[in-house]
Design a protein with these regions (language model features):
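Periplasmic alpha-helical coiled-coil/stalk elements that build and connect Gram-negative outer-membrane
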Residues: 159, 166-283, 393, 397, ...
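Small/polar, glycine/serine/threonine/aspartate-rich low-complexity segments that form flexible
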Residues: 53-62, 72, 111-139, 262-280, ...
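A short glycine-centered flexible hinge/capping loop motif at secondary-structure junctions
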Residues: 214-218, 422-426, 463-465
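Sec/SRP-type N-terminal targeting helices
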Residues: 83, 99, 144-172, 222, ...
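Short flexible linkers and secondary-structure junctions
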Residues: 20-178, 319-323, 353-360
Length: 484
């Protein structure tokens, strides 16, 4: 009785020691306070026109069928989307693998073995005997998830799958906004090309007029050289503008996932972007639900939290049940007979005693959680900075456009006054062409600023999530607090 009591005490101590997960291994990083968005002075004080959040297919409002077709083609064929699809499939497979841990393992076995017995193996010590053994049966095992470790691992895999689903939508948003941005640049490149052609025509007329004046001895030869130099420079500028158009077409074709053949079919854009600065009334309170990168980062924090829970259960005892049933016989015609029936049931309990490997695994999962939290905090702060930068940039461009528009109007008035003076015989055609140069330069500056404003509008759409929105029930799950 005394020995039994001692053995029980020792076994209990070993059991308690083995079940103790290290309490000093725990995360150090904490999730950033989400109210940082609500307290943003820059966003709260912005003078903006209230609007709705971008729709999922927000580019449709641009009324450019060619652009819509390019984006549709890109979403189907782009390597970026193919990578996102592959990542999503991989995450789904991990969920399937984790889900399989809840099911019992069952396998069918069938074997036939023939052997020659040695004299020492033969009970009659004759040797030279042959035997054939037939084996047919089922075997299975089931591990009881007493501590919820498999459940935690499954939930972690599901959260990673949700993050991959959001990443898939983020890839869609990134690709579509990149195409629209390049498309806007292409539209403005065509406008600058038109102005370059207009300037080349102007300089050619100056060369023609100067040549005629020189022929009649009304000007000097250096004036002709100056005019020809201006024409050559204008021609060079036009070639640069034409190159920019071709390069942007190639860039769009690359984003779509096609080659140069597609670039040659892209026509001049007809899209018009509303450049009025407008943001939703709910900004920044609802920004978390509209930014896919923030949502995906939060799902990964939740996944890492569950992985820690699962790692802790590895320190506890594990109960496993194994069973086999089937037939074993030495005669083929007696395999399915009652004497050949065989079965076994084997319950087992296992307890880790040397836990260095388990501690290393827990440290790894804890470090993964800290990394996921740091990434979430970084994403949250970057989102705030991105929206703020876009607002500041658009407000600055808006003020610059006022000045550029005024400059263009004044240059236009000067041009028309000079033109009327020439028509009245009070000025020369060269004066008209010089005034036209000022107008073209002002128009070019205005076009460049307009391009920046339109690009910034596209970037603003992307910073607002590009049409992404997390459902309320998913948002509630993603924002659940971790208890590590």
């Amino acid at each position: 009785m005394m020995k039994y009591t001692k053995l029980t005490a020792v076994a209990s101590m070993v059991l308690l020691y083995g079940c103790a997960a290290p309490s000093n291994i725990k995360p150090t990083n904490q999730l950033a306070d989400q109210t940082i968005l609500e307290h943003s002075q820059n966003l709260r004080d912005s003078q903006l026109t209230p609007a709705v959040w971008p729709a999922q297919d927000w580019w449709v409002v641009l009324n450019d069928r060619q652009l819509e077709n390019l984006i549709d083609l890109a979403l189907k064929n782009s390597p970026d989307m193919q990578l996102a699809n592959a990542s999503l499939k991989n995450a789904s497979a991990m969920v399937m693998a984790a889900d399989a841990q809840f099911d019992p393992s069952v396998s069918a076995d069938a074997s036939l073995s023939r052997a020659r017995l040695s004299r020492s193996q033969d009970y009659s010590f004759q040797g030279h005997r042959y035997g054939t053994i037939y084996n047919l049966g089922l075997s299975g095992s089931y591990s009881f998830d007493l501590w919820g470790g498999e459940r935690d691992a499954w939930e972690g895999a599901v959260n990673n799958q949700r993050a991959a689903q959001v990443d898939h939508q983020a890839a869609r948003i990134t690709l579509s906004t990149a195409i629209v941005q390049s498309y806007v640049q292409l539209a403005n490149a065509y406008a600058l090309q038109d102005l370059a052609q207009k300037d080349l025509d102007r300089t050619n007329r100056i060369v023609d007029i100067t040549s005629r004046l020189l022929k009649h001895g009304l000007t000097s030869e250096d004036r002709l050289y100056t005019a020809q130099s201006g024409a050559a420079a204008a021609k060079q500028t036009l070639k640069k503008r034409e190159l920019a158009v071709s390069q942007l077409k190639n860039a769009i074709a690359t984003l779509v996932g096609q080659g140069p053949d597609l670039a040659s079919t892209i026509h001049r854009p007809s899209a018009h972007i509303d450049t009025e600065l407008a943001l939703p009334r709910e900004l920044p309170a609802n920004l978390l639900a509209h930014r896919p990168d923030i949502v995906a980062a939060k799902w990964r924090v939740e996944a890492s939290s569950k992985e820690i829970d699962s790692a802790k259960t590895r320190f506890y005892p594990n109960v496993n049940l194994s069973a086999t049933a089937g037939f074993k016989a030495m005669l083929g015609d007696a395999v399915f007979g009652e004497p050949s029936q065989a079965w076994s049931v084997q319950p087992a309990i296992s307890l880790p005693l040397f836990t260095t490997g388990l501690k290393a695994n827990l440290i790894e999962k804890t470090a993964g959680y800290d990394s996921a939290v740091a990434q979430y905090n970084k994403t949250l702060v970057n989102a705030l900075g991105e929206v703020s930068d876009n607002i500041l940039a658009m407000q600055s461009i808006e003020m610059q456009l006022d000045d550029a528009h005024q400059s263009m109007n004044l240059a236009d008035k000067s041009y028309h006054i000079t033109e009327k003076r020439y028509e009245a015989g009070m000025g020369s055609q060269l004066e008209v062409l010089m005034a036209e140069q000022q107008l073209i330069q002002a128009e070019s500056s205005f076009t460049l600023l307009k391009n920046q404003q339109q690009e910034q509008q596209v970037l603003l759409v992307r910073s607002l999530g590009g049409g992404f929105y997390q459902a309320p029930e998913a948002k509630q799950a993603a924002t659940s607090s971790s208890t590590h």
